[in-house]
């Protein structure tokens, strides 16, 4: 059976693994998921990620990050634009997550980026997810 929303599946796996304090989480790899993982790494939400080749599409192994007393770094993660209801934001309507404490991941014409970079470059796009 095919998966209707692979990005939501990735975000749910991260949310669930973080809630039970797993060190790593495996998700099926794709270019879009690699871009999202790279944003999470650059913004300090995960420690790192590896792409494991398995002869098919590959596996993306994310190393989750926790504080000194094992408190979660990712406290919330939410899918915004879904296959049944796409959500777009113009360049002057890009949302702020928790007043700038979180990030919005946006798919723009210049690639997948954060809300801060999209605002700086003056581009809008599809709002994929909020992470805080």
Swiss-Prot record:
GO cellular component, one term: ribosome
Recorded GO MF terms: rRNA binding; structural constituent of ribosome
GO BP, one annotated term: translation
Keywords for the protein's UniProt record, in alphabetical order: Ribonucleoprotein, Ribosomal protein, RNA-binding, rRNA-binding
Similarity comment text for this entry: Belongs to the universal ribosomal protein uS8 family.
NCBIfam families, A to Z: PRK00136.1 (NF001109)
Subunit (UniProt): Part of the 30S ribosomal subunit. Contacts proteins S5 and S12.
Protein known as: Small ribosomal subunit protein uS8
Gene: rpsH
């Amino acid at each position: 059976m095919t998966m209707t929303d692979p990005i939501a599946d990735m975000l749910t796996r991260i949310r669930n693994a973080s809630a039970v304090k797993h060190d790593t989480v495996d998700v099926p790899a794709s270019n879009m998921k690699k871009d999202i993982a790279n944003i999470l790494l650059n913004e300090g939400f995960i420690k790192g990620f590896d792409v494991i080749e398995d002869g098919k599409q590959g596996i993306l192994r994310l190393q989750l990050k926790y504080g000194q007393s094992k408190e979660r770094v990712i406290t919330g993660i939410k899918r915004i634009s879904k296959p049944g209801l796409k959500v777009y934001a113009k360049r002057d309507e890009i949302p702020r997550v928790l007043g700038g404490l979180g990030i919005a991941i946006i798919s723009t014409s210049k690639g997948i980026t954060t809300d801060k970079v999209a605002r700086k470059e003056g581009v809008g796009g599809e709002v994929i997810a909020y992470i805080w």
